[in-house]
From Swiss-Prot:
Superkingdom of this protein's organism: Eukaryota
Glycosylation site residues: N4
GO BP annotations listed: proteolysis
Protein name: Pregnancy-associated glycoprotein 55E
Family in the record: Belongs to the peptidase A1 family.
Keyword Hydrolase: yes
Enzyme Commission number(s): 3.4.23.-
Signal peptide extent: none
Tissue and organ expression note: Chorionic epithelium (trophectoderm) and placental cotyledons.
Cellular component, GO, one term: extracellular region
Length: 12
């Protein structure tokens, strides 16, 4: 749950 603007793989 975040912003996949910088890291789409880390948008947890």
């Amino acid at each position: 749950r975040g912003s996949n603007l910088t890291h789409p793989l880390r948008n947890i």
